[in-house]
């Protein structure tokens, strides 16, 4: 059984149907370097034709994906972290140091990636995902999503909104 995907090539004015043979639940999608990457419960997909067709690249369980500095990074359950620096054609498993936590969100900004997860977990990489370090925060609630804009990182989760105290993402505080 195949799933249906919808795509637009005119900024959302009209939509066309494409297909993929995948039936997974997908949680994250991002775009970079003329490539879309979508990921979810059991697959990581790639499209280089604006979403008309999708190819399964690998079978992993990930929740979110971000692109920056010519690198795609996906994060998921049990601290899973995967990186790709060849437009999503191959992926490398990385040690996030967060194996006791699920990582639900990831973003890129100011030449670094920030990922957030269960029990208030915040981690940062300044080398395109090769290594990760903890970020200072007093939050213990799960964090579900993170974004970068206007020179700060903002993360949200269970009854929580926090922001970085500067553009490096080294320390977060409740807002």
Per-region residue spans from a language model:
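Residue-level hotspots at or immediately adjacent to binding/recognition sites across diverse folds
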Residues: 1-175
């Amino acid at each position: 059984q195949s799933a249906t995907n919808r795509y637009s090539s005119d900024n959302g004015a009209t939509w066309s149907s494409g297909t993929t043979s995948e039936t997974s639940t997908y949680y994250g999608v991002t775009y970079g370097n003329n490539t879309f990457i979508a990921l979810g419960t059991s697959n990581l997909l790639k499209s280089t034709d604006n979403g008309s067709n999708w190819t399964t690249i690998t079978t992993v369980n990930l929740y979110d994906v971000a692109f920056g500095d010519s690198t795609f990074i996906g994060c998921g359950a049990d601290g899973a972290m995967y990186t790709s620096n060849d437009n999503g054609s191959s992926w490398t498993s990385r040690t996030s140091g967060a194996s006791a936590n699920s990582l639900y969100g990831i973003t890129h900004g100011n030449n670094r990636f920030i990922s957030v997860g269960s029990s208030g977990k915040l981690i940062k990489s300044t080398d395109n995902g090769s290594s990760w370090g903890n970020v200072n925060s007093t939050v213990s609630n799960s964090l579900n999503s993170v974004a970068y804009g206007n020179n700060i990182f903002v993360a949200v989760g269970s009854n929580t909104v926090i922001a970085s105290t500067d553009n490096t993402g080294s320390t977060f505080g409740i807002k």
